[in-house]
């Protein structure tokens, strides 16, 4: 079984998360996709809204039979993606995981704790976000792992590829942004 992992604060979840989830399921040929609603993001200053509220909102907006909304990071008590992946691979040794991220995350991926370990342990699917395509493609991670990039036309091979492997997809985009939603006051913690 192949499972895409979309980690994030989801503070709040929005239509952009739904859109990239549907695209990832199809284009990366995934059996399932799990939203890993994180208790907190080590790279962000302000804490997110309550876990209960974010999980509830995620379940309301993402209604798909192959998508699971999960609080497993809180239950595993992991803080960093590399730790979470290590624990998930122990818990589910039969599952082939693919880490999913927006292009905005690839642009600063080199700031993540043990980011090379992530690239070396699971395939990584990168989905375009408004305004972040060029910075992502020129990022440190993209340059270092350029020889391991799977062309978008072969994205269906990513989930079964040996690590390191990554693929950048241009997908239809929405301008939805959790940051902008919070700035407008449409979501408060």
From Swiss-Prot:
Molecular-function GO terms, alphabetical: ATP binding; nicotinate-nucleotide adenylyltransferase activity
InterPro entries (UniProt xref): Cyt_trans-like, NadD/NMNAT, Rossmann-like_a/b/a_fold
Keyword list, A-Z: ATP-binding, NAD, Nucleotide-binding, Nucleotidyltransferase, Pyridine nucleotide biosynthesis, Transferase
Reaction equation(s) it catalyzes: nicotinate beta-D-ribonucleotide + ATP + H(+) = deamido-NAD(+) + diphosphate
Listed GO biological process terms: NAD biosynthetic process
Pathway of action: Cofactor biosynthesis; NAD(+) biosynthesis; deamido-NAD(+) from nicotinate D-ribonucleotide: step 1/1
Pfam families assigned to the protein according to its UniProt record, in alphabetical order: CTP_transf_like
Domain of life: Bacteria
EC number: 2.7.7.18
Family: Belongs to the NadD family.
PANTHER family tied to this protein: NICOTINATE-NUCLEOTIDE ADENYLYLTRANSFERASE-RELATED, PHOSPHOPANTETHEINE ADENYLYLTRANSFERASE
Record's function text: Catalyzes the reversible adenylation of nicotinate mononucleotide (NaMN) to nicotinic acid adenine dinucleotide (NaAD).
HAMAP family: NaMN_adenylyltr (MF_00244)
Name of the featured protein: Probable nicotinate-nucleotide adenylyltransferase
Organism: Ruegeria sp. (strain TM1040)
